[in-house]
């Protein structure tokens, strides 16, 4: 059991609870995970390997690290482990190396550091090594085993957490490179809330002049002097977003073109995404084609006796001359029997916005934001600018654990309506724009600039 003192969770977990919670994850994934045909692992064998590792953990931090290691084998962005909240908020376990990084052009670049490192860490320097190990090799060996990483452009935030956060006072030597020079800096992890950050001195991102007609936490609308409406949406979790945009419909209707910026939009409710997309679509429309696992145990029972099922991979099934029941039994044995579905979205928009449209996206465009991209790609002539989206959308099944954290298993996989292969790849832009370190230094938003140029040509 978990013991409590002063309202906080003690950091020991019984072996019985460790076994139960690991087993619960193993079982729930077996019968609910939506991508068994996409991963090449023996789930039962991995469970047996994880058992001794989990039992050997000394505290809740180590325990959840091992759970994360186990679940990351499923290689899906909607499947993962979350630590207990009080553990994540505790400097004892989640202190930070006092440097702030961002992935730019495939490298991890310094955007800020604690004041005491102002003269030792180069601003905009590139992280080259971690404890003497090449950074790419270190990330592959020490970070990727614990996180979803199939789309490397979409996991940079998780990588930075792995690199920077850890137990209080733990140390690391980071090697930075800039202008042909190398900087080795020994650092220790400290309480992130007490770090005094340096100002990078870079200008804020330049924006086209114009009038802001809506400025809320999760949505902003600006009409540029050239008559382009820029709609920035940071989340589709907020159910009030469509209504707030609809409230500005008459002003939007006067625009010469439209930019919808969903870069960094972590998703939420695909119904809200549909409601925004509806302003650019006439009538009702198809939304979010998907598949979910179907389980009928009798077919699995029959399949267990089929010798001809052995050593046949899902890729080889098309070559086999099986009847429908045999095919169903094979798929049921491997939990890759899926039911397809397509949603029809009712168009509740106050009208149709006509004019050229650009959608801005990047590796942090995730989940319901990708559903928005899907609908816009399928039903409009919008131009998509930026970089690939995350490549993960679906319906996670959440379970809260007695030990204080939770896990999620993706139960529904979304399929691009235009036939594009997006699993762990994301939707591709029509116009790819790569962001550089110089863009950060100069305060340039090259993606936005490109979209404005396209719409005003």
Which positions does each model-derived feature cover?
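Active-site diphosphate/adenylate-binding microenvironment
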Residues: 1
């Amino acid at each position: 059991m978990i013991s409590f003192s002063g309202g906080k969770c003690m950091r020991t977990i019984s072996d019985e609870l460790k076994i139960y919670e690991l087993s619960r994850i193993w079982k729930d994934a077996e019968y609910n995970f939506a991508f068994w045909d996409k991963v090449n692992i023996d789930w039962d064998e991995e469970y047996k390997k994880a058992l001794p590792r989990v039992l050997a953990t000394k505290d809740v931090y180590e325990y959840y690290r091992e759970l994360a290691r186990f679940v990351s084998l499923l290689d899906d962005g909607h499947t993962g482990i979350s630590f207990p909240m009080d553990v994540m908020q505790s400097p004892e376990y989640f202190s930070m190396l006092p440097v702030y990084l961002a992935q730019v052009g495939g490298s991890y670049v310094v955007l800020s550091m604690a004041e005491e490192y102002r003269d030792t860490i180069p601003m905009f320097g590139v992280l080259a090594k971690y404890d003497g190990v090449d950074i790419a090799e270190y990330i592959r060996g020490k970070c990727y085993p614990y996180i979803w990483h199939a789309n490397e452009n979409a996991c940079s935030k998780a990588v930075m957490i792995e690199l920077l956060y850890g137990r209080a006072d733990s140390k690391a030597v980071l090697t930075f490179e800039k202008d042909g020079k190398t900087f080795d800096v020994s650092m220790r992890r400290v309480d992130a809330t007490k770090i005094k950050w340096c100002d990078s001195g870079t200008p804020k991102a330049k924006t086209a002049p114009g009038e802001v007609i809506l400025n809320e936490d999760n949505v902003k609308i600006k009409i540029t002097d050239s008559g382009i409406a820029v709609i920035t949406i940071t989340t589709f979790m907020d159910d009030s977003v469509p209504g707030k945009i609809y409230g500005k419909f008459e002003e939007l209707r006067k625009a010469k073109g439209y930019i919808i910026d969903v870069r960094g939009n972590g998703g939420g409710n695909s119904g809200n995404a549909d409601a925004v997309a509806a302003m650019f679509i006439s009538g009702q429309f198809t939304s979010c084609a998907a598949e979910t696992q179907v389980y009928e145990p009798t077919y699995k029972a029959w399949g267990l006796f089929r010798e001809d099922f052995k050593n046949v991979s899902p890729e080889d099934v098309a070559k086999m001359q099986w009847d429908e029941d045999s095919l169903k039994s094979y798929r049921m044995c491997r939990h890759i029997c899926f039911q397809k579905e397509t949603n029809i979205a009712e168009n509740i928009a106050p009208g149709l916005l006509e004019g050229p449209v650009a959608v801005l996206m990047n590796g942090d465009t995730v989940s319901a934001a990708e559903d928005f991209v899907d609908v816009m790609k399928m039903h409009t002539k919008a131009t998509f600018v930026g970089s690939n989206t995350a490549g993960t959308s679906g319906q996670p099944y959440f379970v809260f654990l007695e030990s204080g954290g939770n896990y999620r298993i993706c139960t529904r996989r979304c399929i691009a309506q235009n036939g594009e292969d997006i699993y762990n790849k994301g939707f591709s832009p029509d116009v790819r724009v790569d962001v550089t370190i110089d863009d950060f230094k100069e305060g340039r938003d090259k993606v936005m600039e490109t979209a404005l140029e396209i719409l005003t040509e």
